[in-house]
A protein has these predicted regions:
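Glycine-rich, acidic loop regions that bind phosphate or pyrophosphate groups
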Residues: 73-178
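Glycine-rich phosphate/diphosphate-binding loops that line cofactor/substrate pockets in enzymes
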Residues: 24-39, 59, 100-103, 206-215
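Short glycine-rich anion-binding loops that position phosphate/pyrophosphate groups of nucleotides
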Residues: 44-46, 72-74, 111-114, 222-224
Length: 252
């Protein structure tokens, strides 16, 4: 079919990404200073930013913040980093739940906190202070009440927060506690001799030793992926590609 139209082709547009203002950064710093057990939750749109991976590492160290990655985003920080506190994935182990629920301040950047990471709408809880950073406002105060809502691209927020003068190491014990829980839980997942073949835990452990640090890892949906989620030692130079909605066949 053909038809005459009067509209002219559009021109390329420059995308404008939201940034936090000074007051929002000061509010965030104020909450960090008051918190005894703050935790950083990262995921969602941060997956598209290599710079964000660097900033997450720097922010965690600068403010002594344990880092929880949302489902399918464990590649945002080195999993052997002392700041890594685990993944908010499907049926997270009890120690990872404790890392999330024992925090008194939750700073979530890039993820809407819908679906898997909220652990059945129990996280963040009403007793936790919640700072939510998203590039648009439609998801603020929809599922959870936010104490500070910041409209900003995640990378822009991380960059501005990292450029502040405040540095804190008062949460070192909390950082160690969270990472030790993650490591101790991982150590309990013993390799077993399988009568009908190979224990997939052994396979994942060997992959973790052999794959290059800049690998692209793709995974599908299903219970078998739990081996990867619980055992694979992701590096921030890697790229993890997988579906958050559990659709079969995405790994292919």
């Amino acid at each position: 079919l053909e038809a005459e139209i009067s509209n002219k082709p559009g021109h390329p547009i420059n995308l404008i990404y939201a940034k936090p203002n000074n007051q929002e950064i000061e509010e965030t710093l104020d909450h960090i200073k008051k918190a005894q057990k703050p935790i950083l939750v990262v995921g969602g749109e941060l997956q598209f930013s290599k710079k964000s991976k660097v900033l997450i590492k720097e922010i965690a160290k600068k403010f002594s913040l344990p880092v929880l990655c949302t489902y399918e985003h464990q590649d945002l920080i080195d999993n052997d980093s002392i700041y890594y506190a685990g993944e908010l994935g499907l049926r997270p182990p009890e120690p990872i739940k404790q890392n999330a629920l024992q925090a008194d301040l939750v700073i979530c950047i890039g993820h809407q906190m819908n679906g898997v990471p909220n652990m059945g709408y129990t996280f963040p809880s009403d007793t936790q202070k919640f700072i939510h950073v998203l590039p648009e406002k439609n998801f603020f105060n929809k599922l959870f009440k936010t104490d500070v809502s910041i409209i900003s691209k995640g990378e822009n927020f991380l960059n501005k927060l990292n450029n502040t003068d405040y540095i804190s190491n008062k949460n070192t014990d909390w950082v160690n506690e969270c990472h030790n829980r993650y490591m101790n839980n991982k150590a309990t997942l013993d390799i077993r001799e399988a009568e009908d073949g190979l224990d997939f835990g052994a396979l994942i452990d060997e992959l973790g030793k052999q794959v290059p640090e800049d690998s692209i890892i793709t995974n599908d949906a299903g219970n078998f992926t739990s081996w990867m989620h619980h055992r694979f030692p992701f590096k921030s130079k890697m790229k993890l590609i997988g579906s958050e909605i559990g659709a079969m066949g995405m790994g292919i």
